[in-house]
Regions:
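Active-site catalytic microenvironments for nucleophilic, acid-base chemistry
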Residues: 14, 24, 185-192
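Active-site-proximal flexible loops/turns
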Residues: 20-23, 54, 166, 177, ...
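FAD/FMN-dependent oxidoreductases across multiple families
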Residues: 73-79, 100-180, 191-205, 209
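Predominantly flavin-linked oxidoreductase catalytic cores and closely associated redox partners
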Residues: 1-126
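Short amphipathic alpha-helical face segments that pack within enzyme cores
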Residues: 16, 40, 174-185
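Short acidic (Asp/Glu) and glycine-rich catalytic loops that position anionic groups and cofactors
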Residues: 90-95, 158-162, 181-184
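Short coil/turn segments at secondary-structure boundaries
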Residues: 55-57, 126-129, 216-223
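C-terminal helical "tail/cap" subdomain of flavin- and related membrane-associated enzymes
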Residues: 187-289
């Protein structure tokens, strides 16, 4: 700082995915792997409030919509698209694993442009004005990538502590709550005049009483599951799209014929044996078995 260094008896580390200070303190001994990081990239597009409410079917200005899109939008690779409304803007983007982008030599802005031109997305942002383009790295390793959460004079929160639930797209809430709990612990340390790891261990105890550590432990196998089962990003979304399209359409065919075609559509993409194994693996990853 131009005004000099700032000293404090306790520091709450909120440095995000680039965990330089966390490493310097010896709370973690490695960089996060690209396979455990997602890159979220988006455009913020300006539209007037009335247009947003009309296009998204919002009855009141206090209401909003968040949409998640799975499958072709990420080229069938691990990732997901999103659209969410703000009062006078719409945010449109995708999240894809960093190693996937590198392996397939994909340029994020080209993938995003393809997404924006999708017939389901383009009408929502038609005639809008681009205000921002941005990207953000998100740690998705979860439980296995968490550093030690406290030491003498310091606590680690949010993305810096890999507090992200990839399945439920939770991270902001965990950052806010962990920051609050760290602040409560810091206040207690000030009252005691003791900023040692013994006192700051109260931060982890507070986390254990809530949902963050419980959920991260339960879903500790989920990131690995996504790495080894790309079918859930490409094969199965495509199948469900075709199956539901057929199910809710009137073709003038006997329903037995329709169900036979749906069944054949699945087995053409994935054998029943493998599909059953995929379901079991997903259950284990989600339930933490």
């Amino acid at each position: 700082r131009p005004q000099g260094e700032i000293y404090a008896p306790v520091v709450i580390i909120c440095e995000g995915v680039n965990n330089l200070l966390t490493q310097k303190l010896g709370l973690i001994d490695h960089d996060l792997e690209p396979a455990h990081m997602a890159l979220a990239f988006k455009e913020v597009i300006a539209l007037d409030e009335a247009t947003i409410n009309s296009r998204f079917g919002l009855p009141h200005k206090e209401h909003g919509v968040a949409v998640s899109v799975l499958g072709d939008v990420s080229l069938g690779l691990p990732g997901m698209g999103f659209v969410y409304t703000n009062k006078k803007t719409v945010s449109v983007g995708l999240g894809m694993m960093l190693d996937t982008l590198a392996e397939h030599k994909l340029r994020p802005y080209e993938v995003l442009q393809r997404y924006l031109e999708h017939p389901a997305i383009a009408p929502l942002v038609k005639d809008g004005q681009l205000l921002e383009y941005g990207g953000h790295l998100i740690p998705e390793g979860g439980w296995h990538d968490m550093p030690q959460l406290y030491t003498d004079g310091a606590m680690v929160t949010g993305d810096a502590a890999s507090m992200v639930n990839a399945l439920h797209w939770e991270g902001t809430n965990m950052a806010m709550i962990s920051g609050k709990l760290a602040a409560e612990t810091a206040i207690e340390a000030h009252e005691r005049g003791d900023f040692s790891a013994v006192t700051l261990s109260g931060y982890k105890e507070r986390l254990q009483e809530g949902f963050i550590l419980r959920d991260l432990k339960q879903y500790r196998k989920f990131s690995r599951f996504l790495e080894t089962h790309p079918e859930f990003m490409g094969t199965y979304p495509a199948f469900l799209n075709d199956a539901l399209g057929g199910f809710f359409s009137a073709y003038g065919k006997p329903k037995r014929t329709l169900f036979t075609e749906i069944f054949q559509s699945l087995t053409h993409r994935r054998s029943l044996f493998k599909a059953a194994g995929d379901i079991v693996s997903m259950g284990r990853a989600v339930l933490g078995w």
